Amino acid sequence: MATTVVLCSGGLDSSVIAKWAVEELGGRVICLFVDYGQRNAPFERRAAERIAEAVGAEFETVGTFWLRRLCPDNPMFAGRLPREAGTEDLSANWLPARNWNLLGVAAALCDHLYLEGEDDEFHIVWGINAEEAERFPDNTKEFADAVAEALKRGLPSRPRLHSPLAELYKPGIVRLGSELGAPMELSVSCYNPIWEDDTPVHCGECEACYHRKRAFERAGIEDPTEYLE
């Protein structure tokens, strides 16, 4: 039986790739949440856990905090993420080597399970997409292809890297999620979320909420998200 590790941040894309992994790859699926000290980690972790439960996957969480120690003033840690839509830029969202860090943790889990003799076929699924690839170099297909080759060459578990959203923009991701029956309503995109009755509530005003609203609108899919504004 194959084992698949899904990098699950608790966001919209994560809810779609988690469902995709269960439907397309089958076998044992583990949703892996990495807490690297991001300011919304408690909200994101809860969302990731609920997504895993909804799709019938296992859930694992790992803490890795060297990024926060190296970059303490980064907006991801310092609480200065843009409040209003239209104020976002690369400096507000770029965390040095974050995707390397996340992929490394997923790869380490694959190797651990391989060395324990639990499986001999491994997959890693992550949610890079075409929209973010236009701004972030570690979200491009070229980067993913290079990492996929490195994983095969550098690890005894030889995990295969899957990027099912790499050629999709947000509306396409929403459509795919709808087709799969992904639990998008459980995901958290907001920079300033709150929880009410174990349900994520989005502020409706930040850049992330703007992109989320627009994605559902352009996809022609009813938005299940609860917004304050």
Curated annotation (Swiss-Prot):
Protein residues bound to Zn(2+): 190, 203, 206, 209
The pathway noted for it is:
Purine metabolism; 7-cyano-7-deazaguanine biosynthesis
EC number(s) recorded for this UniProt protein: 6.3.4.20
Mind telling me which Pfam families this protein's record contains? QueC (PF06508)
Q: Which UniProt keywords apply?
A: ATP-binding, Ligase, Metal-binding, Nucleotide-binding, Zinc
Q: Which residues bind ATP?
A: 8-18
Entry's Gene3D superfamilies? HUPs (3.40.50.620)
Q: Which SUPFAM superfamilies match?
A: Adenine nucleotide alpha hydrolases-like
- State the Gene Ontology terms under molecular function: ATP binding; ligase activity, forming carbon-nitrogen bonds; zinc ion binding
**Catalysed reaction(s)?**
7-carboxy-7-deazaguanine + NH4(+) + ATP = 7-cyano-7-deazaguanine + ADP + phosphate + H2O + H(+)
Q: What does this protein do?
A: Catalyzes the ATP-dependent conversion of 7-carboxy-7-deazaguanine (CDG) to 7-cyano-7-deazaguanine (preQ(0)).
Q: What is this protein called?
A: 7-cyano-7-deazaguanine synthase
UniProt organism field: Methanopyrus kandleri (strain AV19 / DSM 6324 / JCM 9639 / NBRC 100938)
